[in-house]
Amino acid sequence: LLHKSHLSDVAIAKVLTPAPPQPSPSVDALREVGWEWKRVLAALRGAGSPLPVILSSFQLKHAPLAQVAPALIADGGTPEENAKLLLGAKWKAEEVAQALRGADLAPDMVARALQAANVKRPELIASLRALKLSEADLITVLHDTGHGADVVWSDLKASDPDANNLARLLKKSGYGCTDIAKAIKGKHPELAATLKTIKCEPVEIGVALGQAGTPRREIAALMKELGCDRSFIVRALKQLGAPPSEIADAMRKSQFNADDVALGMRLNSVSADEASRAMASAKFPKDQIPAALAYAGYRSNKP
């Protein structure tokens, strides 16, 4: 009878809704006369029913979330607020993610909304996987929503045992070589090889190895084995804080000759005096040092 009357939707909802608002009977009545979920929600909201009560009623009535979410969005809440409301009404995080995505919310916005609703990372990842994202897109969303390379690596390595492939996807998604190296850890030669495989620059490789815990004395040998130029090895060790004497010693032990060390030093703005002292400290033969400095292009101070 009310449906056939000329009353507004809100007026009908007010008549059907008891006080304090308990909209379950109203939901049944309004649905029986063919109202869509969006119309029911708008009417009950206008009648003063709180959203949490309405949504709990919808959930109990097995309302399809794909229809409820657009109605909720049309009501004006933010994605974060809507996610909290839907989760509070006992819908699962995966269902909420799919509903928000179905309402044209971008995957990263879906992730932010779920995070704001305190969805834990394992459940968040499962929810994003329910959106049928590729592994690359999933990692990009996690990167863009503030998750570190270490936690992404930890969470995804079980599903992608190919370390090189997962590392490549991390780099493609915006993670830096140092962050990736810290996440991977593992044996130093294997880590160095992975960094080269994912196309980290030579200096990036050296710095990343050092930041990931590889002793500086090993880095020169690892970089040489990868085919890195002497100047890049000096630069990486210098950026890691190694003094010239330590750099020269590491390079001598990695079978670089005096000419290589001197040239690497000059190309990285180490003075002739510093280079000479460093090479002497590293026990290069004294008679080789002047010739090596000359080979590297250092000017002699002798008249």
Language model features by range: what are they?
Residues 1-303:
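General marker for long, soluble alpha-helical cores
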